[in-house]
Amino acid sequence: IASRMIQGRANCTLIHQSNQGLSAARNTGLEHAKGEYVTFIDSDDFIQEGTIEALLAVLDMHPEYDILEYPVVQHHGNKQCEKLLTFSEKAFTSARDYWLGGGYQHTYACNKYYRRRLFEGVRYPVGKVFEDAYTLPFLLAKAGVIGTTGRGLYYYTDNPQGITARAGGQELTHLLEAHLRHLAQWGTLTAAYYESLLNIQMDVYEATKAAPVLPVLPY
């Protein structure tokens, strides 16, 4: 099917690779990427027609953007959980302002366009769950301007059998480790972010009974 789809499309490359997980697939794509910007679409998901053109138009208007985040339908297909996460037209020159302003709540790799050079020396960790939360802060640290837009739309399909939906102790530990890895990057934390981390820590303890590792801060 993939071979037929790329016939006659000189701008498409078909890569064959054994299934090594999401991070390995993205990393292989990054090794072969040639354009100025890169983005990702997971195998269960899709984008609204016209999204690519709309986002490239935003990037043409704002060549200073190193990362551009756009709206996403969360848990598409699950009417009880489906939710639209949208954004205003905004630019952040501080990674800290973006992250503590709520960016930590939507660390998805897929509803963003990245300047390809940001991935120089940065790859997704193979074998870890919540790899997005681990990798995004590295990219934010290298970005000069992070933009958000209300244009375009990504559909994040609900998968009750997916790894994140069935996250247990090990997976939640990966998520907590991802946030702790970058804690010093943000300086003084907001109470809302610390509360989010505390909730993750409590979930980890509930699942594993391992001693808490989240630093105790005066909130």
Description of each model-found segment:
Residues 38:
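Short aromatic/hydrophobic "clamp" motif used to bind/position activated sugar donors
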Residues 1, 17-33:
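Glycine-rich, basic loop-to-helix element that forms the pyrophosphate-binding segment
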Residues 157-219:
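C-terminal subregions of glycosyltransferases and related glycan-biosynthesis enzymes
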Residues 22-23, 43-146, 157-170:
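Donor-binding/catalytic cores of nucleotide-activated saccharide
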Residues 7, 31-34, 60:
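Residue-level signal for alpha-helix termini/capping positions
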Residues 1-5, 28, 46, 50-52:
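Acidic helix N-cap motif at the loop->helix transition within catalytic regions
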Residues 1-16:
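Acidic donor-binding segment of Leloir-type glycosyltransferases
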Residues 18, 71, 150:
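Nucleotide-sugar donor-binding loop of glycosyltransferases
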